[in-house]
Amino acid sequence: MGPIRKPVNQWELSENVKRNLGTFGEMYVQYSTSPSQTAAAAVFKMFGQYLRTLFQTHLEILQSDGAGDPSVRMDVLQRIEELLGTTVSDDSVFEVIEAHLSKVKDIFGNCSVTWIADVKAADRAVTAAVTGTVHAVTGGMGAMWGTLDRAMIDLKLDLVLPPTTGPSTNFVGVALPATPLVPYTAGSAQGSPLDPTLDRFGALFGLFGLTIPTATKKVFLEQNDILNKAVQAISVSYTAMNSNFQAGLAKYKPPRVPTADGALTARGIAPDRPRQAKYETVKTYATNMGFDVLIGGKVPGSKGDIESLVSGILLAGKSLDELGALVGGIGSDGAIVSRDQMDQVRSLIDSLVKIIYDTDRDRFIAMTGVHVITEYANDLLRVLDLIAQKYGEFQRTISGLEPSWATIVSNTEGLIPLYAERAAYAAERAVIIDEFQKMAMDHANNVKEVEHIRERAAATQKQTEERRAVDIQKLAVETTAKMTDMKNGYEKTIADLRAQLSVANLSLESLKGTLKGETTLGTTVMDLSKANRQLESRVAELQGKLGIQENEAKLRDEQHKAQAEQIANLHRDLRVATERLHKKDTKILETGINTGVSTARVRELEQRVKELVAEKKSIRHENRMARRKMDPTEAAAKGGPRQSERPRSQTAVHAHCALIRKNLHDTNKRLLTRNTRLEKSISSKEELISSLTIKGNALSSQLADAREQHAVLKREYDALRAERGGTARTKKDALEALQSKLTQSESQLAIEKLKVMELEAAAKRLGKSSVTKSEVETVEVRVNLLTEELARTKKTVDELRKLNNAYLTAKDRLQARVEALTTDNQSMKLLVGNGGTLDEANKRITTLTQRLATVSGELVTATETLAFVRGSLKRVNHQRDELAKESAATKKSCEAQIRALTDRHATEMRTAAGARDGLEAELGRVKRTLVDTETKLAGVERDRVVLRDELTRMQKASHIGADRQLTHAEKVAHDMGVLNAGLTLARTELREIQRELVHEKNKSRDAEQRHVASEAALREQIRTLTDERDRLLATGVADLQRENAELHAAITEAANTCADTKIQLENITADYNGLLAEYERRLGRRPPGPVDPPATTEEPIAGYGGGNWDTGSGAARAPIDHHDMFGISSLLGESQGGLSDYHGSYAGGRELSSEESGDDESVDPVPDSNGTRGDGVCREEDEEDRQGGETESGGEEEESEEESEESEDEDPPSAGGPLELIGVPAGGIGADPEPARVPSRRPVTLLERRGAHVAEPKPTPRVRGKRPAARHSHKRVHLSITRETLRLALAAGPEMSAEEIFQRLNTDMETSSLINSLTVTAADIPRGQLAVLNRDTAVEYATPGTPVSDRDHQRVELSMKAILLIMICAKHGIMNHEEFTDGDLSWFKSYDNNLSVTGSDSE
């Protein structure tokens, strides 16, 4: 088995169980092949050790720090990620748990647990089996094997136990119902009382493919006393564990949490409280501590599952957020402004204290249970070791076992409980019997019909044989007469041919004399043929070189395309330079505007200097009077102080300010002059750029013309090649003319062949009897009918399969509804336990009874439908098999008859072929004589003429093609020279532009150095303007220099490419001339045709749009925008998107309307220090008024359209999406806003504390106080719903009522994200009173306490999607069910289909 690595977390533990169970299986396979005593003892010893390690490791992981304390584990997704070992994004909690359960089911085999509720039920059944075995099974053996059963079920091996008898009890005196379990298939209902125990023994080892013979049972009974003592020890340990657990719970001391009024008091763990009832017994806690913790993802907490544990912690976090929001909204003096706020603060504090108590109590219970369960597990493991040790004594009998994997399969099938389906199977059996009887009758009828068809086929075959004998005799007589006529005709034809042959022999003798004189001519013709073959080989060689030249021409064309792209890049770079110059002009204009702003600042400083001088004079006057101990009246009477200092101080100040104004005026004038000069320079550079653009376009047109000429030459070359192909076709025509006479002589033979074919056709027609055709047609009709019946049967089977699938779907839906009813029943029990009224319980019971009756009826109907469908499917399958067999038999019979007819016809054809072969042999000899004679006579003269014409034509075409090729190469070289000259000119002009820009830069620096501020009072402002101007000018010049360098590099590269292309053209021309000279030297003439490069596809030259102007990668480089440096948008009154301070203006802020924005025109807006919109310049008291106004009424800033579009178009992230909300006034939608004393801060959400991205919510426009609220003002509220938000909603506890849900949907920012596209039509909705109207179904849902008379004015219309999410919250316990009085909720069963919808609605 190898070493077992100790896991460190639950995921590794699960993988370890999976791997080692597979290893145990391999060990048993090896043992089964060669059984021995040593191997058996080793296997079971290692299995016992592994069980001990498994239990201890599981308990250590639960208590270790690495796995996390169960009471502090907060995040459900983190818990699931640790269990799965993978990253979980935004899937819902329940889907992940269900997927994990399915994976565990595959790992551990035939595990029937599919949900957490089933896990709890299975654990309760195991506990009942363990505690009830002492009373149900004879002796202590039953208790021992019950303990083993508990261990096996903890390992999810699903060992099925025999039924227990009598009620079983746990150790605290609470009666448990008897658990009926499916008995083992070995027949436990008969035999001795020890048979059930022995059956369990066999089932345990049957899991591993082993069987227990009688000898083993005997040894087992001998060990009864020893194992009974072990079971008694386990019972004592169990009782001690229970006592220790109760004692540990009694030691619990609740924490002391101070409260304001001391109304809440801490309580201990009391057994009589319903909330703590499930922790009073070790049985229930041991269930929670079993292996279902590993599988179902549970943690020891308040309720033993993930949802309840996390909901309390999330509720605490949410309460803290709400408390922070309330505290932030209270006034600066600390007073609570309303009774509602006071009640809300008190309830939040109480809920926080309650959560602290519950969390601490659950943590104590979990730790106590961990301690006591560890001791019990150790005792249990010791007993398991004892069992493994004693089983080593069974090795003498085990060695004789013959395990078989077939036994494993049969035992596994016997373990599956089938009681629930026996009734359905019995009904199906009756239906199947009826259908079988019907099918038997149909089969008998089909057999009779087949026998009748066979009889008819036999009679038909007999008639066919008789008619065929008569027809063959007639055919033999007619054939003999026709063969005689054909023989006479052939003899006459042969005599004529022999006469013609004698005449041809005489002509041949005369031609022989002529041929002797033509011997020299024949020799010449042979020489010409040899020269022609050499010429053809050379032509093939030149064609190969032509292919190479064509490839080189393609490369040149690609280089031309690259050059065209480089020219286009140069055009784009020139355009970028033009845009940069325009931007520089804009920046200079902005500098002038800022200079005007500085002038206004100088005036303000002058006013401030005047005020300071006056204040200084007053202070000196008072000091002087104090020194003289005189009041101002006496000083005035005695002449007062000297007045000469004041005029002198005022004059100095005025002179100083005049000097400053003069300097600023001169500076402004110099800047305007420089601006004019730069504009002229820019216009001149634009003219240069336009001229370069025109030249580039001219080069592009020349390149296009060159391509057109190349295409024309290519077409001519194709025409010449076609003409050369025509010459070859002429030679072929000459050869065909030589065979024309042969064709004439063959025509007579063809006529005779046609006659023979007619005879063969007649024989075939007569060989087939009409009776045989009728018989075959009859059989074929029957086969077609059977085929159609089979197709209809297949169609029926498909329809039945569809019905079966529909039934399975309906069954799943019914199961879901049954689970919903179970949840309703549990919630009703909770309602009664919490003190609900009897009337409410009765109403709920009535509703559930009706729904249960409906579901039961549908279940019965679906079961009957399934039985009928299964019976019909079996009947149709049987009928299809019968039809297939009958069709195969009929087809086989038809094929046998056809083969017999074919053999008979072949025999007759062989007889007729003998006479035909003799005639064809004689005609063949005549044919060969004629062909030899005519070929020798007609070949010589025509070949001589054809060869002479071909040589003349090829020589002329070769001269013409060579001349055209040289002309084309010279033209391409000339075009490249023109292109190189144009690029050189463009490079020279760009260098001139660069020198001008450098000169302008030097002049600008000189002007900047001369412009230095001379006054200390304004030195800081003037230095700021100078630095800004220097930075802008340096940036513009550096960009232009960099662009010029890039243009220079591109032009240099293009020139180098042109030079390389020219060299390549020269080399190609030289190679061509060399080949031409070699051709003429060897053959004494020029080649037969021109050799030109192939035509290329014209591609348009790239324009100015698109593409990266720097690298050509296809993405345009965004221009740098320095717009924000000067605050131009602030000067024009526009808002910089994303820079407004939302936190300080949300609670009490308001948005100025178009009328209000024009009331205050005395404020001159200027940019403040951070670039956002300022509030004005002029007076300090204006600044103080603005600060006071923000405190009382606020000043909310507008958001730009770009920011709004970006926030709406953004997709939410996959995990932890943004909760982007639109806030609503505290009084409800449409209510008048209450003035807040301080700006309230937005509370920090739970997602922000975890680090998730939460976007800034958009502030809602506020309505002015002096404006009365409209009763029906339609408002649009766009909200978003994500899986993260839904997960938070599902994790919330049931403490929130429906009224609180509705209030948060309309007033609270955090929980209003539960609804997607909430449309509110009521203008004024009081708190606590609300009615919801579904626009799709016209169904109204009213909250308690809503007056009927005012309902029309307090209605909120929700879309189907919004109500759908509310109902999901209700399903998971956030609100109570009975507050929705409408009964038609059939659409609610498909709510899962809408969970993936995100974003805002367009309604």
From Swiss-Prot:
Regions of compositional bias (Basic and acidic residues) in chain numbering: 620-632
Bias type Acidic residues, positions: 1154-1163, 1193-1212
Quote the biased-composition stretches of kind Basic residues, using this chain's numbering. Answer: 1261-1275
- Region annotation (Disordered) ranges: 620-650, 1083-1116, 1142-1239, 1253-1275
Q: What is this protein called?
A: Uncharacterized protein ORF22
Q: Which organism is it from?
A: Ictalurid herpesvirus 1 (strain Auburn) (IcHV-1)
Which gene is the coding source of this polypeptide chain?
A: ORF22
